[in-house]
Amino acid sequence: MQLLVGLLLAAVAARAHYTFPRLVVNGQPEDKDWSVTRMTKNAQSKQGVQDPTSPDIRCYTSQTAPNVATVPAGATVHYISTQQINHPGPTQYYLAKVPAGSSAKTWDGSGAVWFKISTTMPYLDNNKQLVWPNQNTYTTVNTTIPADTPSGEYLLRVEQIALHLASQPNGAQFYLACSQIQITGGGNGTPGPLVALPGAYKSNDPGILVNIYSMQPGDYKPPGPPVWSG
């Protein structure tokens, strides 16, 4: 009986969590799950990362992906989720340029190489509840690759930070993925500031250790560097 209860609880927990296995570029999804997006360690369990200082906060990967997606500068991108994104919290996107002599198919994204290209802020719904864009949908919010991003190979990283339990230490849950992309038709911008993952976040950052049930929408402070919009 206890085993059955445990299995049922595990199944419920899995349905409450999610992964982002498929990148969509200008409305066109990658051919199949984990084709250009690196398979994450939680591909089966769907559990998020809870220690923002651990190496898993970078890409949470168990392996690299076999392919690289072509993404024009200025393109709109988002991810398909395996389950409904039902937890409240921001969605943020980062890019990291692959160094010369390395490949998007093998590079690990280490060092101060990541820059943020977008984040989302909460708002009050008709019931005066704090919600985030694309909450309770099956896709992450759209973002645009800045037109001034230099051409080349990159890792594209998405994270959705679930904050429903974030009033306690390490209660925030990070659901994330990294995709291997080739940006074409880029510009001459200088993206920044550049940060390392791990390194950009602390467990007690105000956007990570936070009680979202006692705040107004404008009070929230997303973790990490400011957005580079090109």
Swiss-Prot record:
Q: Which UniProt keywords apply?
A: Carbohydrate metabolism, Cellulose degradation, Copper, Disulfide bond, Glycoprotein, Metal-binding, Monooxygenase, Oxidoreductase, Polysaccharide degradation, Secreted, Signal
The reaction(s) catalysed by this protein are:
[(1->4)-beta-D-glucosyl]n+m + reduced acceptor + O2 = 4-dehydro-beta-D-glucosyl-[(1->4)-beta-D-glucosyl]n-1 + [(1->4)-beta-D-glucosyl]m + acceptor + H2O
Q: Which GO terms describe its molecular function?
A: metal ion binding; monooxygenase activity
The entry sums up its family as follows: Belongs to the polysaccharide monooxygenase AA9 family.
How is this UniProt entry's protein used in applied science? Lignocellulose is the most abundant polymeric composite on Earth and is a recalcitrant but promising renewable substrate for industrial biotechnology applications. Together with cellobiose dehydrogenases (CDHs) an enzymatic system capable of oxidative cellulose cleavage is formed, which increases the efficiency of cellulases and put LPMOs at focus of biofuel research.
List the signal peptide residues.
1-16
Q: Where does Cu(2+) bind?
A: H17, H87, Y175
Q: Which cysteines are joined by disulfide bonds?
A: C59-C178
GO BP of this protein: cellulose catabolic process
Query: What is the documented function of this protein?
Result: Lytic polysaccharide monooxygenase (LPMO) that depolymerizes crystalline and amorphous polysaccharides via the oxidation of scissile alpha- or beta-(1-4)-glycosidic bonds, yielding C1 and C4 oxidation products. Catalysis by LPMOs requires the reduction of the active-site copper from Cu(II) to Cu(I) by a reducing agent and H(2)O(2) or O(2) as a cosubstrate. Shows endoglucanase activity on tamarind xyloglucan. Shows no activity on wheat arabinoxylan, konjac glucomannan, acetylated spruce galactoglucomannan, or cellopentaose.
Query: What Gene Ontology cellular-component terms does the record carry?
Result: extracellular region
Glycan attachment positions? N142
Q: What is the protein name for this chain?
A: AA9 family lytic polysaccharide monooxygenase T
Q: What class of enzyme is it?
A: oxidoreductase
EC number(s) reported in the record = 1.14.99.56
Q: Which cofactor does this sequence's record say it needs?
A: Cu(2+)
Intracellular or extracellular location(s)? Secreted
Top-rank taxon of the source lineage equals Eukaryota
What's the source species for this entry?
Answer: Thermothielavioides terrestris (strain ATCC 38088 / NRRL 8126) (Thielavia terrestris)
Which residues of this UniProt protein bind O2?
H164, Q173
